[in-house]
Amino acid sequence: MIDTLPDNVELFENSQLLEWNKNNQIISCQFKNGNIKTKKIIFATNGFLKSLGIKKNYNFPITLTASMTRSLTDEEFESIGSPQEWGVLPVRPMGATIRMTKDRRILIRNTAEVHNPLRMSQSELIKRSSKQKLGIKKRFPQLPNNIIQSTWSGIVSRSRNSSQIFEK
């Protein structure tokens, strides 16, 4: 999408917005490294829309944490039936997801919580990784305990009616 933007559209990524206001159909934005005035703007803020004073009671950030195993050895892969790649997705938006990737890794996400996503410590991340290790062990008890290679967290935005917030 970025590569196909028309010439009259400018993209500002990783630009901390300090203040904005709208006056007579002109939007003024003050950033750390400069200012812009425009008639139209897209604030791509995910769960942080309310920090801009927009739709304060409509959405909030949810922290999701996922872990991925290292690639399974031939022996480990055979012990779980040598499956093709597969995935189980939840019926509910915040339910657990587990997948077997083409390169024999297991990806699991089974934590969704209201948590300040900018302040997760390494020990908190390790706690969540332990939950995911438990989820993998319940389904695949024959796999070793040290199988998780990486764990990460990110945010998604939830709105009161489970839809996106997009308007002029």
What are these regions (language model features)?
Residues M1-K39:
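Helical element adjacent to the flavin cofactor pocket in flavoenzyme catalytic cores
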